[in-house]
Swiss-Prot record:
The lineage of its organism: Eukaryota, Metazoa, Chordata, Craniata, Vertebrata. Glycans are attached at N144, N209, N351, N366. Belongs to the TGF-beta family. It comes from Oryctolagus cuniculus. Disulfide bonds join C309-C374, C338-C406, C342-C408. The modification Phosphoserine is found at S91. This is Bone morphogenetic protein 4. Homodimer; disulfide-linked. Interacts with GREM2. Part of a complex consisting of TWSG1 and CHRD. Interacts with the serine proteases, HTRA1 and HTRA3; the interaction with either inhibits BMP4-mediated signaling. The HTRA protease activity is required for this inhibition. Interacts with SOSTDC1. Interacts with FBN1 (via N-terminal domain) and FBN2. Interacts with type I receptor BMPR1A. Interacts with type II receptor BMPR2. Interacts with FSTL1; this interaction inhibits the activation of the BMP4/Smad1/5/8 signaling pathway. Interacts with SCUBE3. Interacts with TGFBR3.
Amino acid sequence: MIPGNRMLMVVLLCQVLLGGASHASLIPETGKKKVAEIQGHAGGRRSGQSHELLRDFEATLLQMFGLRRHPQPSKSAVIPDYMRDLYRLQSGEEEEEEQMPSGGLEYPERPASRANTVRSFHHEEHLENIPGTSENSAFRFLFNLSSIPENEAISSAELRLFREQVDQGPDWERGFHRINIYEVMKPPAEAVPGHLITRLLDTRLVHHNVTRWETFDVSPAVLRWTREKQPNHGLAVEVTHFHHTRTHQGQHVRLSRSLLQGSGDWAQFRPLLVTFGHDGRGHALTRRRRAKRSLKHHPQRARKKNKNCRRHALYVDFSDVGWNDWIVAPPGYQAFYCHGDCPFPLADHFNSTNHAIVQTLVNSVNSSIPKACCVPTELSAISMLYLDEYDKVVLKNYQEMVVEGCGCR
């Protein structure tokens, strides 16, 4: 059984065991009577067996999602706006005007083209000011990447820093500053506090009259830590100002939380490390256009009384299986399923194989040979934004989750 069909089967079985009217969205009308019969025959044995089966089913689902256990997010878990916007761009939701990503975010075509998983990491709040020259301000950030699975190959990584427009002043028109990003090769020596051995990863000269996020390539450092298993001593960020006094330094590049800033506000403006990786399963992230998918399915909706093989609606609601506490988006999705007769002779629109045509022909003269079956012939992926077991936000592409076409096979 292909992974997509396994996924649908397990979800349906979970709903049968859970029972109740609240789960009707996952059970087609034609199957409700059968569900009632199963529940009736189960009797007193249902409770214990159901819980045991549910555990097995959930374990199977979590394994398919690449998780070792059911995530239980803490109340302090934060979903970065960047990850929400990236999900909307990747899934095609940016076509809806009211959900346009903020800040003019552009979809990262190049890093996403080699990845099926995007992960975000906030620094460990272990912020160290690094003493430097009078015109510089430098900070060290430590990111814990231990939650990245061993089978996930990182292809690229970026550090995102938020900077605010500097108030106008005498040097406003010619005001520039340079942001340097370093990998810390060795931690501060005890004999020389604050002194770091670093290597430059990326640098940018920016004008201070714009409020925006800046993205820096830190792939060499993250690849050393994950692929080569080298020690992770963090990143150093240095901001060099050319036309400001020491009192104005670092105030517009958000590297640390101010005393007057609330925790909620700071959470959305903290430095963010984003990794792009691939676990070897399925295809890379690709932007999808929702409008095209909707138009594609309109012809099948008109044939409501047709009993022949076709696609039927099947909405999977993650709240029905108690997963809405860790799955951020989507709240559910239209999985669809295939059902119907494969009559003789098979017409071209049944999308049949030569073998199915021969099998149907033989069935017409010998009923002991079964008819061809109505099955999915085309499947597509969905993207999920969720919190993993370590409260890290993950955007992942899951293959073969949506039935796009049915046929007799």
